[in-house]
Amino acid sequence: MQSVIHSAHRIVVKVGSSLVTNDGAGLDHAALERWASEIADLMRRGKEVVLVSSGAIAEGIKRLGWSAKPSAVHEKQAAAAVGQMGLCEAYERVFTAHNLKTAQVLLTHEDMADRTRYLNARTTLLTLLSLNVVPIINENDTVVTSEIKLGDNDTLGALVTNLIEADALVILTDQQGLYTADPRKHPDAEFVHEACAGNPELEAMAGGAGSSVGTGGMLTKILAAKRAARSGATTVIACGREANVLSRLADGEAIGTQLVAQNDRWAARKQWLADHLRLAGRLVLDDGAARAVTARHTSLLPIGVIAVEGEFLRGDAVACVNSDGREVARGLANYSSDEARMIMRHPTRDIERLLGYVGEPELIHRDNLVNL
């Protein structure tokens, strides 16, 4: 079995609290230097990397002089706000040593649920990756309530994987991977090297093993892998204490548990766009645009749209129909229906003049467009 990381181009790496803190007592700066070095190695290989990092609350607890992790939500949020400053400062320092720039991105589950915010977050992250910047993502613990719970950053890692359509999610933890049972209680438990993400038997195997430092046990990682597989991403759950673990995974070495998505990325996205989104409106295409979208799989430009039907917002799903009214594609609109009516039949260069701003040059980007 070869690690999927060898062939993956876009990777989300989630690093747990126990791998970036001194047993919960503030940040482990030597560990951060190691992660920066390994991620820099991946990027030298031509890979795009997004880092989802825990550690803000633990660093905040240290800076505030508290002896233990608080149980009250408002105190956790205060610790997160204080600690996030130190986390960003530390990551900026260690990545600068490798001539890499970093960007802080704080997200909530609500950002993923709202289509407009979802598209904005996606566009920002993809722009950062195109600029060779390392986005460092954490949950916005200062403003959320229900999300400061078990497994928040495991879930966040999977959501980010879906958001940017990454090829793989790597969840680094202080455990070797998944066993058929808790090896601390069952010495005969067997290690699971590879399985299909979403297999219900995996959840029974996961048990409740987890670190006291972080908030996620193995079950949350299994569920995160299941979520990541929805966009066709394979997940690797591996021990972050293995020497050069990311570089070795990139070499193809089989480390940890690999949970394979059953559908590839494009098949998963096609199913999601075609079957699971409620259509909010229709765009009527001229013959040239209909041919370009269906035959050449191009983005849909405003100049190719001759009519806009219905009322929709940026990020809503819309049907694309030809001049005979037959649906030929559907996708996520970059502009609202009102804006679309203003820019239809116009070349891209006119968007800023017509709207006063330009978001994206296309009405629907080809990555958000599926032919039917």
Swiss-Prot record:
Subcellular compartments: Cytoplasm
InterPro entries, A to Z: AceGlu_kinase-like_sf (IPR036393), Asp/Glu/Uridylate_kinase (IPR001048), G5K_ProB (IPR041739), Glu/AcGlu_kinase (IPR001057), Glu_5kinase (IPR011529), Glu_5kinase/COase_Synthase (IPR005715), Glutamate_5-kinase_CS (IPR019797), PUA (IPR002478)
Chain sites annotated for binding substrate: S54, D141, N153
Extent of the signal sequence: none
Keywords from the named record: Amino-acid biosynthesis, ATP-binding, Cytoplasm, Kinase, Nucleotide-binding, Proline biosynthesis, Transferase
GO molecular function: ATP binding; glutamate 5-kinase activity; RNA binding
Pathway info: Amino-acid biosynthesis; L-proline biosynthesis; L-glutamate 5-semialdehyde from L-glutamate: step 1/2
Domain PUA: 280-358
Pfam families xref list: AA_kinase, PUA
GO biological-process terms attached to the record: L-proline biosynthetic process
Keyword Ubl conjugation: no
Reactions that this protein is recorded to catalyse: L-glutamate + ATP = L-glutamyl 5-phosphate + ADP
Keyword Zinc-finger: no
Gene3D superfamilies named in the record: Acetylglutamate kinase-like, PUA domain
Homology family: Belongs to the glutamate 5-kinase family.
Function: Catalyzes the transfer of a phosphate group to glutamate to form L-glutamate 5-phosphate.
Name the UniProt record assigns to this protein: Glutamate 5-kinase
Record organism: Laribacter hongkongensis (strain HLHK9)
